Amino acid sequence: MAYRFEVLDLNFQNVPHTIAVYLFRHDKGLALIESGPGSTVPALEKALTARGFTFGDITDVLLTHIHLDHAGAAGFLARRGATIHVHPVGAPHMIHPEKLLKSAGRIYGDMMDTLWGEFLPVPEEKVHVVQDEEDIVIGDLRFTPLDTPGHAYHHYAYMFEGVCFSGDVGGVRLPLGNNTRHLRLPMPPPEFHLEKWRASLTRLREAAPRAIVPTHFGPYEDVNWHLDAIERELDDVEGFLEAVMPSQPSVEELERKLDGWVLEKNQRDGIDPETHHAYETANPTWMSASGLARYWKKFRQSQ
């Protein structure tokens, strides 16, 4: 299938095929979906240079959401001229990222700088707040954002010429190993929400994309399998929670149980240790354990 975009591999933490940026050419320069984290700016520069471009050629960056692996370099690119398109709930945190960075610091601790690098604020005049289904027209490119919470409340998937750039609501699926039909859900705190994710999945189905392109790491043309896999994972996660959480495990105990659950799925799908490491780099199990614990306590424990 022919596409009007290019996949740029940011080689996050020296692990290929874990974080992508998607590049589009138009008559006045380049547009990107995602910026990647600040730590991968050198990899982004290398990819641009190989194509004869510089940071100054980037006119627009469309963010699926503001988590550091997707939006961390947006401020850097904005200061070199790019307009940053973002969900209205996420926009204030791009301009004033102190709360976002404090929250991330609680999660990542001493690993913050190594993993994510510098997160610069985006100048307010470089932020374009985008509403649900409001077309973004850049030269001869037209993108349509779809409000798709579940991974985060401020999440957009973008439709472009029948292709869905699904951010994280489309799951994590890496083109590695012997089996590329393996999908995991990234479920971080504080905004993972099972029911909202189900509603977003319905919306993705209704969009009827011809291909689906998760940030971790596309594209894929077996759209029906992919969307069905998301639904199976949501069902499996709910079953896991209902089996495990009534005993009120600590987050550490929950993480151990979730690790075992993930390894069982690896065995089922024939996932080798190197591929598992790549999945853990893109979507660490310990982070999902924290997200699941928070979701259960806030939304399910009192039911």
Which residues does each PLM region occupy?
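C-terminal regulatory/interaction regions
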Residues: F240-Q303
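Divalent-metal (often Zn2+) His-rich catalytic cores of metallo-beta-lactamase-fold enzymes
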Residues: R80, R198-V251
